Amino acid sequence: MSVFTPLARPELETFLAPYGLGRLLDFQGIAAGSENTNFFISLEQGEFVLTLVERGPVQEMPFFIDLLDVLHEADLPVPYALRTTDGVALRELKGKPALLQPRLSGKHIKVANAQHCAQVGELQAHLHLATQGERMIKRKTDRGLDWMLEEGTEFLSHLSDEPRALLQKALDEITERKDKILALPRANIHADLFRDNAMFEGTHLTGLIDFYNACSGPMLYDVAIALNDWCSDEEGVIDGPRARAFLGAYAALRPFTAAEAELWPTMLRVACVRFWLSRLIAAEQFAGQDVLIHDPQEFEQRLAQRQKVSTPLPFAL
């Protein structure tokens, strides 16, 4: 179970008291997290999620609080940091930054259909529109293009011939097209919008969670990350009907530009590289530990399938 920082009931009761939400009824560690420690918290006045942030600089935590406040004020279904009765949102527990947030209704879906994908595309467009231009809150990701080039080059020697050649080709493409990628239209992006970070009740999207990889960056990169997960089949091939539903719903709210249409195949590959590398690193770092490790080969397979992209962006000339 991925509870990196275990907590005892008395510690929790002391921490939760300043929120004025009643007695602690129950709490449970969440096994699904792979980077942070999360607990479901039941208090007399409702259901909540407590997050202890395990990765990233503490000084960047106000970014996440401010971003979620902006999205909450834009009526998007996102968690947001609750304040204590003294108005404090960011607190500390066991030496880690700690946030208490409302627990959103719904559950994750394992198999997405076109209706699910359309709702995710629509919500992602709303997220980007709410934070583009002057509304964007700046934060540089710690897993951007420079990180991919550095970590990818280091990992080449860890791979056998075929995956090494696949990764090298992708790194060469990132180097060649880096300036064009960075010049694409920008906003705040979720940067991790996988199926396990969205909540559904049936086919109704009820929430988007886990913004701890969020940053400012190219909106197309965010689209590519999400589509690679929501619209891939078991062999890593993009499913046309799901992809068209996703992209059509997104573009109905924020039409894609000519530059985005040109870089779409590249960006799908870049999004694969980012998660292939982070999973390879996690697999080495946490080998033999009781930590959820996502399969790196899933994104190696997807990158191989993205060498040819047959689903273009819906772009009106």
Which positions does each model-derived feature cover?
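Conserved NTP-binding catalytic cores of kinases and kinase-like/nucleotidyltransferase enzymes
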Residues: M1-T85, E201-H204, T311-L317
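Active-site acidic catalytic loop and adjacent metal/ATP-binding pocket
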Residues: A31-E44, V49-L50, A81, T175-Y221, ...
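ATP-binding pocket architecture of kinase catalytic cores
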Residues: L43-M136
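A glycine-centered beta->alpha junction motif in the catalytic cores
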Residues: A98-V111, E150-H158, V273-Q289
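A cross-family kinase active-site recognition segment
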Residues: K110-R164, L184-R186, L292-I293
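ATP/Mg2+ or Mg2+-diphosphate-binding catalytic cores
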Residues: T153-E154, F275-L317
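Active-site activation/catalytic loop segments of kinase-like enzymes and analogous catalytic loops
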Residues: L220-P255, V270-A287
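All-alpha amphipathic helical-bundle segments outside canonical DNA-binding/catalytic cores
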Residues: F256-L268
